[in-house]
């Protein structure tokens, strides 16, 4: 399966039991910041934004004082899983990023999608990739 198919079929799909509810944007990005696949709506990000995210996985709490920035949007960092998941909130939406062995699985949402639904979609694919050694 291509990386684009993972984004299209597993991240940008309807959320179980909520037809028509889906993430606003999604991507799979290598640890080096290279985009493996993304939705058409995923924001163009700066290398330093991705560096900040990568640093937070290695040094949990790094982003807390400044917030998580992606594509010029600032998210307030909320409870995640140190070294595994970063979650951010901005207004009625937010972001979930799951780290796998080789990549970062990113999902961005707005209402009516809930934070829990975004977490489920992103982390399910991230866990699958981890099981596959990716």
UniProtKB/Swiss-Prot annotation:
The entry's comment on post-translational modification says: Phosphorylated by MAP kinases.
Q: Which SUPFAM superfamilies does UniProt cross-reference here?
A: Profilin (actin-binding protein)
Entry GO CC: cell cortex; cytoskeleton
Q: Which Gene3D superfamilies match?
A: Dynein light chain 2a, cytoplasmic (3.30.450.30)
Q: Which residues cross the membrane?
A: none
Cystine links in this protein are: 13-118
Q: Sorted alphabetically, which Pfam families does this protein's record hold?
A: Profilin
**Positions of post-translational Phosphothreonine modification:** 114
Give GO terms: molecular function aspect only. Answer: actin monomer binding
**Motif Involved in PIP2 interaction mapped to chain:** 84-100
CDD domains per UniProt: PROF
> Where found?
Cytoplasm, Cytoskeleton
- Keyword set for this entry? Actin-binding, Allergen, Cytoplasm, Cytoskeleton, Disulfide bond, Phosphoprotein
User: Which PROSITE patterns does this one have?
Assistant: PROFILIN
An additional note in the Swiss-Prot or TrEMBL entry is:
The variability of the residues taking part of IgE-binding epitopes might be responsible of the difference in cross-reactivity among olive pollen cultivars, and between distantly related pollen species, leading to a variable range of allergy reactions among atopic patients.
Stated role: Binds to actin and affects the structure of the cytoskeleton. At high concentrations, profilin prevents the polymerization of actin, whereas it enhances it at low concentrations.
Question: According to its UniProt record, which protein family does this protein belong to?
Answer: Belongs to the profilin family.
| UniProt subunit comment | Occurs in many kinds of cells as a complex with monomeric actin in a 1:1 ratio.
Q: What is this protein called?
A: Profilin-2
């Amino acid at each position: 399966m291509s990386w684009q198919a993972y984004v299209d079929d597993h991240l940008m799909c309807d959320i179980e039991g909520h037809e028509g509810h889906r993430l606003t944007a999604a991507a799979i990005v290598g640890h080096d910041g290279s985009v493996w696949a993304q939705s058409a709506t995923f924001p163009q990000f700066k290398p330093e934004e991705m560096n900040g995210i990568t640093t937070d996985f290695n040094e949990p709490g790094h982003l807390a004082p400044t917030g998580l920035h992606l594509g010029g949007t600032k998210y307030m960092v909320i409870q995640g899983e140190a070294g595994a998941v970063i979650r951010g909130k901005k207004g009625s939406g937010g972001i979930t990023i799951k780290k796998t062995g080789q990549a970062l699985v990113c999902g961005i949402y707005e209402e009516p999608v809930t934070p829990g639904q975004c977490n489920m979609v992103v982390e399910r694919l991230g866990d699958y990739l981890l099981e596959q050694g990716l």
